[in-house]
Amino acid sequence: MINHSSKNEIKKQISHIALIMDGNGRWASSRGLPRYEGHAQGLITLRKLLRDLKDSKLNYLTLFTFSIDNWKRPKEETSKLMQLLRKFISNDLSELHNNNVRIRVIGSRSEIPRDIVDLIKGAESLTVNNTGLYLQIAFNYSGRQEIINAT
């Protein structure tokens, strides 16, 4: 049994949470909806999570959102995923900045549309001095590729 002081110690130790945003398309398909609707619902859930974390002591949140392997999906689906990133940065940046969130996007930018790369750079630049939650978005990312690039 954990006593009250032990629970507080555990809470203090959590400083980084990483989430793999997977299964949204399957969730939508299982409900007879287009896969995109699942991804859009995932964005709604992410917004709620970020608002819930606003006053938390969490230091880092890493979101694995789009793997390099996701390029194997149909072009229509990858285009809609790009639209979601575009929408997230465009619509949510002001609120995130006002909540002192620092944004960093990791992953290869070479295949990402230029306008999205510009949005990413702008978000990172605007929030670089923020000292609250560090939101790291792994987009067009591969851990394996990162290891290969490091060697």
Q: What spans do the regions from the language model cover?
A:
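Flexible, compositionally biased loop and terminal segments
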Residues: 1-151
